[in-house]
Structure formats: structure tokens, C-alpha cells
């Protein structure tokens, strides 16, 4: 019995290692030290195209509202950190308000200046200032801040799937966005349908292409409608049944009616 139990544990650990699942996200009241810089327009969302290395689009609009950040590797995690929410605050500059502000990881920071480095949008950096001192704080350039991971709550939104440009009958690339709670997705699986439209009940793992975009390179013509199964960093599984229709198109959004709780 003990031997069998050990084998089961070993199998579970193997699965966790294969899919890169974390043991879970720990949300605490503790603050950690970090450095913050900013880039782009003073009141912008960071990149000029309102995008970033996570693949999110229109980060100047809700739910991002330009409150975005590049993260260095401990935050970006080669794309696994895309969509995570953090509270940040600054206290050691005369222009700092000391009030926490929430930002979302949407991009990669290639110039780490500390163990944790938030390269913020101009909007997010200025949001840490006292009223009327946004520009004065931005003139500091680089400041010490504190941060902590917090749950994401995109009020009024369900998880959205964007079939990326270039997708075709044997290649499917999907951006996952607006996930609540952890904000991140660590595994995405797809279920095809039979010609009749009924689901095959067979899940096929997709692999992370880059950022929050997942891909499937198929050896056959893919048959929709497609169901998508997401696993969050905390291990919660959410399924969007037949969310992408049989007559799907590339470069198109497909909204779901599911959300992480």
C-alpha cells in the first residue's frame, strides 16, 4: 500500500512538473521591496501600440486603464506572470502619496535594476503621487517602491479568447485575457467537435507560444466548435464549452460566460 501511495504521489508530481503548475498563489498583507521606473508617454499605457509582450491588446482601455507594468523575470516568468495583479506604493519620495495602486503585468522588462523591477506605464508611475504631483514624481525617474500580489477583479467581465492572426485549419493560436483571481493561466487545453457538432470529449493540451498566447500545431484539420479548459496558478479549472464556433475566424474575439472565482 505504501509503495502504491508513493507511486501515486510521484505521478502527481510528474504531472505538476509537466504542466508547470504552482503550488498556489499566496496573498498576504506583507510588502516586498522593489524598484520602479517608467516608460512611454507620461499619461500613456506604456507601449505606443497599447500592447506588450503578453499579447494583450488595448491596454489603455478597461480593465487595464493604462495601469500596466513590465515585469522583470521574477514577475514576468517567461509569460507565466502575464495578467497578474500587484499593489504598489512609494513612500520615500516627497511626491509619493503612500497610497497603494493596482497594476497588471502586461509586458517584459529587459533591464532589471533590482531583484524585483516594475517598469511602469507613465500613468501607473504617476498614480503613486500625491494630488497634482504626478509629473514631479515621474521626474524622479527611478524610485524605491513596495509591492504585493493581490487578486484580480475585472468587474463585469468574463474570460475572453482572441483567436490570433495567422491561425488556420491546422494551427490555432489563442490569447486568454481578463481572468479574475490569479489573473494568470498556467495551462490551456482544447476540445474539438465531431462533424455533427457534438464534442469529442478528448482534451488536447496547447502550449504557451508567448506571453498569454497559447498554440496548437495539429496534424489534422481542426474541427470546431472548440471548448477551452483553463487552469489557474492556484489550480482552479474553468471550462468554456464550445466557446469558439465552427465557422471561427482568425483575428477575432470570442467572449465566454465563464470566470475564475
Swiss-Prot record:
It is a peripheral membrane protein. Residues 51-157 form the Expansin-like EG45 domain. Expressed in roots. Its main location: secreted. GO terms for cellular component: extracellular region; membrane. It is found in: Secreted, Cell wall; Membrane. The keyword Membrane applies. GO terms for biological process: plant-type cell wall loosening; sexual reproduction. It comes from the Eukaryota. Residues 170-256 form the Expansin-like CBD domain. Belongs to the expansin family. Expansin B subfamily. May cause loosening and extension of plant cell walls by disrupting non-covalent bonding between cellulose microfibrils and matrix glucans. No enzymatic activity has been found. May be required for rapid internodal elongation in deepwater rice during submergence. This is Expansin-B2. The gene is EXPB2.
Amino acid at each position: 500500500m505504501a509503495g502504491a501511495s508513493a507511486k501515486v504521489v510521484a505521478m502527481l508530481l510528474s504531472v505538476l512538473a509537466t504542466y508547470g503548475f504552482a503550488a498556489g498563489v499566496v496573498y498576504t498583507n506583507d510588502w516586498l521591496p522593489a524598484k520602479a521606473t517608467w516608460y512611454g508617454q507620461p499619461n500613456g499605457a506604456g507601449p505606443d501600440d497599447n500592447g506588450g509582450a503578453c499579447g494583450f491588446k488595448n491596454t489603455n482601455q478597461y480593465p487595464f486603464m493604462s495601469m500596466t507594468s513590465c515585469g522583470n523575470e521574477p514577475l514576468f516568468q517567461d509569460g507565466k506572470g502575464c495578467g497578474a495583479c500587484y499593489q504598489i506604493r512609494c513612500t520615500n519620495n516627497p511626491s509619493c502619496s503612500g497610497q497603494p495602486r493596482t497594476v497588471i503585468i502586461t509586458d517584459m522588462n529587459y533591464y532589471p535594476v533590482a531583484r524585483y523591477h516594475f517598469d511602469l506605464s507613465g500613468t501607473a508611475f504617476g498614480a503613486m503621487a500625491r494630488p497634482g504631483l504626478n509629473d514631479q514624481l515621474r521626474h524622479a525617474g527611478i524610485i524605491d517602491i513596495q509591492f504585493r500580489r493581490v487578486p484580480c477583479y475585472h468587474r463585469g467581465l468574463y474570460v475572453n479568447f482572441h483567436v490570433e492572426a495567422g491561425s488556420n485549419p491546422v494551427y490555432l493560436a489563442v490569447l486568454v485575457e481578463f481572468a479574475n483571481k490569479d489573473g494568470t493561466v498556467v495551462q490551456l487545453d482544447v476540445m474539438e467537435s465531431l462533424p455533427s457538432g457534438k464534442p469529442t470529449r478528448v482534451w488536447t493540451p496547447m502550449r504557451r507560444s508567448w506571453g498569454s498566447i497559447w498554440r496548437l500545431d495539429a496534424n489534422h484539420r481542426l474541427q470546431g466548435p472548440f471548448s477551452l479548459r483553463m487552469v489557474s496558478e492556484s489550480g482552479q479549472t474553468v471550462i468554456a464549452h464550445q466557446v469558439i464556433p465552427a465557422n471561427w475566424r482568425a483575428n477575432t474575439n470570442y467572449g465566454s460566460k465563464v470566470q475564475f472565482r
